Amino acid sequence: MSNYHFETLQLHVGQEQADPASDARAVPIYATTSYVFHNSQHAADRFSLADSGNIYGRLTNSTQDVFEKRIAALEGGTAGLAVASGAAAIVYAIQALARQGEHIVAQKTIYGGTSNLLAHTLPQYGITTTFVDAHNLEEVEAAIQPNTKAVYIETLGNPNSDIPDIDAIAGIAHRHGLPLVIDNTFGTPYLIRPIEHGADIVVHSATKFIGGHGTTLGGVIVDAGTFDWAGSGAYPWISEPNPSYHGVQFTKAAPTAPFVTYVRAILLRDEGACISPFAAFLLLQGTETLSLRLERHAENTKRVVEFLVKHPMVESVSHPSLPDHPDHALYEKYFPNGGASIFTFRIKGGREEAFKFIDSLKIFSLLANVADVKSLVIHPASTTHAQLTDEELANVGIYQNTIRLSIGTEHIDDILADLDQALNAVK
């Protein structure tokens, strides 16, 4: 279906015809842990990867399979793997690339959970990270060491929606024989397809825009199918016979998608952060309206940014659509259809004024999620980034008067009225 437009792909990929067992047009929920093999040879072929069908619910599920194919198609990749959460997708992507004594280069302005993973959790297992200013290409390249195994960035940073030059960073990574891993959670494949700009692996928290309704946890890894794992020689667990899987060479068993096949066959098998068929079904419902929702998110965000910039209680707004934003040119290059509906602004005052504003809102919900159809708000310095010192917070552009907004799809007049009354309550 590669010739179809995005809006068609989001509805049909993975289930081009009605369900063969029931003639159901909607994707069924396959609530099963296991699958019957036709005979002993059929079972052996499944386990050797000679046959790519279902083995066990921790690895694959027919509902999950449709979701994986659909997201991979929307991203322009060769295959996808759905897992239990966005955090699981990120952990698996890094674990599949780096071992004890090895190293990652990462953008410093990334999601706080990912930053904590790279800065504190993975070093306990011997994997270290150098955090860099992704806008400083010389700094990015200088951070690469002989033991570096990947470069990791986000299409839109969290929480300030800063934008790296993906094409340039991909060039640096590939010049050093490294895969580029990109978190496209905030970008979504509707607004930007990182693979077209050089990404080798794309990860998502499907909990966010893909699901879109704040109901379901899930994560996705997409294999671009472009990285030369065999030629690299730096990832023998993918390119050479793997002793934990009967000597399978994933580059030969799954030549178009060896990376996600390795993650599924080894890491998901052993660590088990699998997605449930119910979650996959709910995320499919979100996927089918992704383009419609993103258009409304973008329209509403534009109006909110224009409103905040002019409000006397607002000190500054960090949104790349603004001409004076340092990433404005990159925003126009990579996001011609708009976006960045998760962004921050600084209220005049400090922590007390920020709390007063947040507690005065009526439509906006105070919670840790983002990218919901409902508008959301949070104070990053005391919540999502609370583990950072004031110096570390400032280093990633967060202050005590910083407020993160996630603009939903409510009527724009109601959103603006709520923001206005809450800002006026602080005066």
Describe the predicted segments one by one.
Residues 156, 185-187, 322, 348, ...:
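Active-site beta-loop-alpha junctions enriched in small/polar residues
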Residues 2, 14-18, 79-311:
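Conserved PLP-enzyme active-site core in the AAT-like
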Residues 222, 344-346, 406-408:
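Short hydrophobic/aromatic beta-strand micro-patches
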Residues 39-88, 113-121:
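Conserved N-terminal alpha-helix of the aminotransferase class I/II PLP-enzyme fold
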Residues 2-61, 69-70:
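N-terminal "arm"/small-domain region of PLP-dependent enzymes with the aminotransferase-like
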Residues 119, 128, 146, 293, ...:
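PLP-dependent enzyme catalytic core of the Aspartate aminotransferase-like
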Residues 76, 147, 313-316, 363, ...:
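Glycine-centered tight turns that cap/initiate beta-strands
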Residues 271-274, 279-280, 285-289, 294-296, ...:
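Conserved small-domain helix->loop->beta segment predominantly found in fold-type I
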